[in-house]
Amino acid sequence: MAYQIFEMSDGQRVALYAQGNSVLYCLLPFARGMLPIEVKRDYLAHFEARVFRDTVCYVYENLEHTIILDTLGNGPARIILTDGPLGYGFCNLHLVVRDGDLYLFYQAFSGREKGYGLYVCMPYQENCRGV
């Protein structure tokens, strides 16, 4: 379990982390008696988060082996990647914010090709993927 701490534009700090099958967050400073808030219950692996447009965005692999992008408090989660019929596996998820856009870099293992490839997608833009 590794905490990721983010500071928002209003100065509020947020700690976000995965534990067991849960994704949790809490506002800082953390006072005695406060409990973290569970936002997801289907976490499996590969947790990564960034602040994008003053919102904490996070990505992870869920229990169904799909890659999910979600935000703290804003809108529904989005399925970004699925394993498909070829049996892909995903790892090394890395969110990057650059020039006002959000990018997801990841590696995918293809059972057919027996190797990893490096890919990038822009989760908030349709059909914007690259190798």
PLM-predicted stretches and their roles:
Residues 1-131:
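Extracellular, repeat-based ectodomains that mediate carbohydrate processing or recognition
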